[in-house]
Each structure stands twice: as structure tokens, then as C-alpha cells.
Amino acid sequence: MMYKVIKRDGAVTDFNIAKISSAISKAFDALNKETHPTVIDLLALKVTSDFEGKIKDGLIAVEDIQDSVESVLSQAGYADVAKAYILYRKQREKVRNMKSTILDYKELVDSYVKVSDWRVKENSTVTYSVGGLILSNSGAITANYWLSEVYDEEIANAHRNGDIHLHDLSMLTGYCAGWSLKQLIQEGLGGVPGKITSSPASHLATLCNQMVNFLGIMQNEWAGAQAFSSFDTYLAPFVKADNLSYREVKKCIESFIFGVNTPSRWGTQAPFSNITLDWTVPNDLAELNAIVGGKEMPFKYKDCKKEMDMVNKAFIETMIEGDANGRGFQYPIPTYSITRDFDWSDTENNRLLFEMTAKYGTPYFSNYINSDMEPSDIRSMCCRLRLDLRELRKKSGGFFGSGESTGSIGVVTINMPRIAYLAEDEADFYRRLDKLMDISARSLSVKRTVITKLLNEGLYPYTRRYLGTFENHFSTIGLIGMNEVGLNAKWLRADMTHEKTQQFTKEVLDHMRERLSDYQEEYGDLYNLEATPAESTTYRFAKHYVAQFPDIITAAKDGGTPYYTNSSHLPVSFSEDIFEALDIQDDLQTRYTSGTVFHAFLGEKLPDWTSTASLVRKIAENYKLPYYTISPTYSVCKDHGYIAGEHFTCPECGGQTEVYSRITGYYRPVQNWNDGKAQEFKDRTVYNLGASHLKNERTVSHTAEDGKHKETPKASNGARVMLFTTKTCPNCKIAYTLLDKANIGYEKIDAEAQEDLTMKYGIRQAPTLIVTDGDGYESFVNLSNIKKFIEQC
């Protein structure tokens, strides 16, 4: 039987029995033990017999061969030679490890300067520049450190061989983080020894400057996106306090937007920033006194709706206008909340919002109508209770963003097509998947331990000052290429457009969720399942395995650059009918707990704002998926500005243009994409609304938020009032003070210690106030609703 050997670096070579004979001879020589060559050859033959059962698909791993050498030598009575062989293996391993930690500085610099390495375009946000060169050099050293000094050989080899992808190896940091804008407003910027400290901002212009600096500082301590929540709600009181004109507000917002798009971050990049905008004042903030200059104002957030509209108008107008050349702003990526009380009428801000969406595809939309998310989730992570260690929480804050005081310490993506290609059947597929999930979970636990130690030692001074802990940050496991799983799996042989592959994908996602619950119990950390954006991983995996297994099926057409389809998405050339794609994706995307989004790729901008608003509304009201975008393609000419659609040359002057499309979650010029993603763009079929048909359309009536107009009961003399708190909740202390000041008698309940009461009343977060008369009870969740209860008593 002819078979091949998989080397440690993943390369495949022809089997050569002479190499086994040579290794055995060296073990005998090490003991000065003479033996006839025929004995050596006989032992080598026995080795081939020993590992025969480990050969799969004509392939055998070099480690399996070496294990068999040890076994055969021991069984043949050469225990001393077996020991010498083990020492020989360890010595070879040390030499390999030494080589892996030595970088060729000339190759390192030349590969970047000459753009000979595909990783120069690994991240489309990094411009070819001296800053990019510095990032490339330091990143290579840091990645080597992770793989050679931190992770064990099993984890490092799984990454090197392309079984998994350990994201952000170039950074000795966590992945992404959401920050409390309220905390910045209350405490100001600083508090780090030896660094300048600024008092809480008293004016909008000052706050905008502090936000730009804050995001830039934090970006240097994290690898990925930095996020603020409730941007419009928290900024509105500054407009009200100073009675600012619209012109003054717009100047402030312009300075913020231009500031966060300045390439001030490592690698000559702008800080990867995300903001969420509430559009209407959220219920959990409405009754709270607004904060300006670090102090409470004599008015509440609900009193600032007019000013909130001014902030939103200024933000959208600036984003629509673009820069001096008509180029759309890359950051911040805005996420808008679509709730049941979203006003779809013809208002100035609605026209602007959906014009921006149609022209640049800028915003993400959070679906709070049909998804299982709540608008307050984005601000309540640090107050959520963890009574059930198996409960998988949703990571809030949008596709790239994160809710307040939460985020992810790291991401590992599993190469699903490779598992399918090697698996004999479904049972073998799950065995292989479980092993890689175990390795991934362990790698994330190792990373959490390392960066937590570094946090405590002061390596991330501003993160330590404003966050202090990674306890509310997730360990993220993602996947890629379920479409190609269907094509490569012997029991499927069908892509994601076929029902049997869709059903298998649902079963796989459910299986992965169950194992993540196991890891939460085992490690005591939060785990989440992500539809990985995989900007470069899609290309790295496919490129690596096409070289190793030429017959593996990728998403590329014959002769095209190989790539894998993101997560469990449909083939990019599937259909012009957007609703046909949504019908399939809806049941898949809702199985993830983060990072899942549906991109409505359009050839060019929709004709008017009403058609855009109609599409956004139809998706929210008819589907359960949590996040989505409207993503038109557009071009920019340096002389003639914005051009709708894909035009690599300007229709006016014939000059070269920049063509912009969404690469994974953000807009970048197609010319900057890596080869795999560029091939995906070529293969993509854009949606045509004229050819799209929504079946069984439903419309959700415009209603007020649940509970907004309920009459709040008063605490009668016979009522029992209980305040459920936790030791770490920052709002619980404020709730005590308000209740004491109002002379309302209450019992303080430790929600984590008194689980029976917590479960009885369905407490999910702190603070929560329960008022009961024995027959029934009323629940007041969050500080805003508790304050409203107190005022009406």
C-alpha cells in the first residue's frame, strides 16, 4: 500500500522506510550497541505493521510513526534502545523549537517591503507604511512568543497545521472591549500614575476630545474593536446644559468623527471603534438624572429627546457628507436599535438615517423586535447574575462592538472543512470536532490566565484603571466553512443551499453550544459561539489545505483563488432574492451567541430613503436574526467624489477609482483586500430587490415599550419590599441610598447567596426591586425603574 506522511509543519511527503531504519540505527549507535543491518530492517518492517491501523485516507502522521518505533523496540526486548530513541526524539524536538524561535530578520523585513507575503494584506485596515512595517515586525516576534513560550505543543501545532486559527497572535493583549461612556463622563480621562489626568468634561467639545483620546489609548491595549454604548443618550445632556445651537453640536460631532478616523493606532491604523445609538431614550436610563461634568443635573435623560435628535442629526449628516474627497468614514461603525417603538414616520432624522444607509451602508441594525435580545442588555453585563454556569449568554453590542464592561479576551476559529474532508462518517466528524474544541477551549483558558497576570502587573494601565478585571469578558470559539463541510463530507456532498446540509449545520451548532456549556463549568469562564468574521482566516485555511490536499473542495470556482465561505453562510453566488437567503439564514444565525450578522449586499445604493427604510423594517419584523446591514457597493474618484456602484475607472474622467465594499464587517477599498477575499468579491451575486419576494409578510404595529405606561404600584404597609443586589454591582449602592432617603423599608437580598428567592422571582440582574403582597408581585428591574417606583410612592 502506498501512503504519505504528514510532517509537523503540515507538509505531506512520500513515506520512506529508510528513514525509520536510520533513526533506529542512531539509537543503537548512541549506546555503542552493535547489531546486524538485517535486524534493523526487520524492526523497521515491524514498525510499519504497528502503525498500519493509524493510516487514514492514505496518510500517517510522523508522530504516530515515532510512537510505533518506541513500542516495537520495547516489545522486541530493546528497552534500553527504546529509551535512547526517546531521548533522541526529545533532542530533535529541542532543535526544532530552537529553530522556530529564531526569526530571519532579512526575510521578515523584505517580505513586507516587497509585499511578497500575503499577510501584508492580512488586515485591510493596515496601510502599507512604515507603521505597518513596525507592526509586522513586532507582530512576528509576539506570535513566536505565544507559540513557542506560552502555548504547549498540541495547541501550537494545531494552529501551525491549520486545524484551528488563534486570532491576534501578533498582540499580547485581549481581543475586543466595550467601555462605559457614563464612567468616562463621571470620572474624566486619566487616573494612571505618571500620566496626565483630565477632569470630567463639562462641555460637549471637551467630551468629544476625551472620547477620541480614550478610544486611541484603549486601542493600544487591545487587538480589536473598542466600543461605546448609548452615544446619543449620554451626549444629549451636554447639549441641553449649554443650550447649544445645532451648528455648535455639529462642529463637536465632526471633530469626533474626523478624530477617530485619524491613523493614530499601531500599524498606521485608525482606532477600530464602534458606537451604539439608542435613537429613543431607553427605559433603563429614562428616569435617571443626567450627568454633565461628573455631576447629576436637575433633569433626567428622558428630558433630553430634542437634544438627542440634534446629536443624531449631526452625526448622520457628517457621515453622509464624507471626507473632503467624498470618501465615507470607516469609523465609528454605528449600530442602531430597531425596537417595537421605533418611529418609522417621515421625519428629518429618519430620512437622514436611511439616506446614509443607502449611500454608504454605514450602520448596523440591532433587531430588538423579533430577536431574544433586550435593549438594556448592552448596559447590564456587569450586573447580570451567574447562577447557572451552563447558561450561554449573548455577547451584546453589535457585530464588532461590545456592551459596557464586556468583550472578548480572545478568538479561536475551527477549520470545519478540514474535519469534514478527513472524517469517515458523522461519528468521526464529531470526534475530530470535539478534540479541536477541547484544544481551543484550553488555549483560551491559557490566554486568559496570561493576560490576567499581565493586567494585574500593570501592562495594560488604562484597562486596569477603567475595567480592572476580565471576569465579564468572553472566551470566543468560532467556525468557518460549513458550506464547504457539505461539499467535502462523504455523507452529504451538497452545499448550504441543500436542506440536508442546513440540518446538519444546525445539529453541529447545537452540539458546539452544549460543549461550550461544559467548558463554562470546567473553567469557570464565559464562553460564546461566534460566526467568525474571518477576514484572513478564510484565505489562510483554504490556501494551506489546497497545497496539502489538492482535491479538497473550496468555495472558489475552477482556477480561482481558494477561500472558504464565512461561518454557516450560503455560497456568495447563491441568489438575487434577498428573502430566499434570509429564510435559510434565520434559523442558522440565531444559534450563535455572538458575531453573527446578515449582510444585504446590493450592487449600488437604493433609489431613495423610503425603500431603504422599508427593507430595514421588513427584515426586523419578519426575521429573528439579531444583526444585519444594508451593504451597497460604491466607488470614489479623487476628482469627482462618490459614484454609486462598482466602477474601477471613473465614468467622468476615466481615472482610477477606489471601489468600496464590506469585506467582513466594515468598508474598505477592494484593492486592499487579500487574494481570498478579492476572489469572494468577484464571485458574489448581489441582491436585487426587484427579484426578491417576501413570503407571509407581517407588520408589527407601532407600540410603546412594554411597561412604559403601566401604573406603578405603591408599597402599602403590608407589602414586602426586597432589593436584590450583588457585591460587584455599581448601581446597587445607589439604589440603597435612594430607598433610604425616601424612607422606604426594604430587605436587602444577596441575589447570589439566596438562590431560592432569586429563582422564585426570576431575578436576572441587579439591582432588582420586588414588591409583593403575598398573592402576587411587581418587579422593577434596573436603577431607572427603581427610581420611578420611589418617586411614585
Describe the predicted segments one by one.
Residues 711-742:
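Local sequence-structure signature of Cys/Sec-based thiol-disulfide redox active-site neighborhoods
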Residues 1-107, 469:
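Charged, amphipathic alpha-helical regulatory modules used
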Residues 633-652, 658, 662-718, 741:
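Intrinsic, low-complexity terminal and presequence regions
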Residues 744-756:
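Thiol-based oxidoreductase modules, predominantly thioredoxin-like and allied folds used
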Residues 91-95, 101-471, 492, 498-652, ...:
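Conserved catalytic cores of very large enzyme subunits
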Residues 68-74, 278-279, 461-485:
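Core structural elements
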Residues 761-770:
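Structural micro-motif
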Residues 772-793:
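Non-catalytic, surface beta->alpha helical segment in thiol-disulfide oxidoreductase systems
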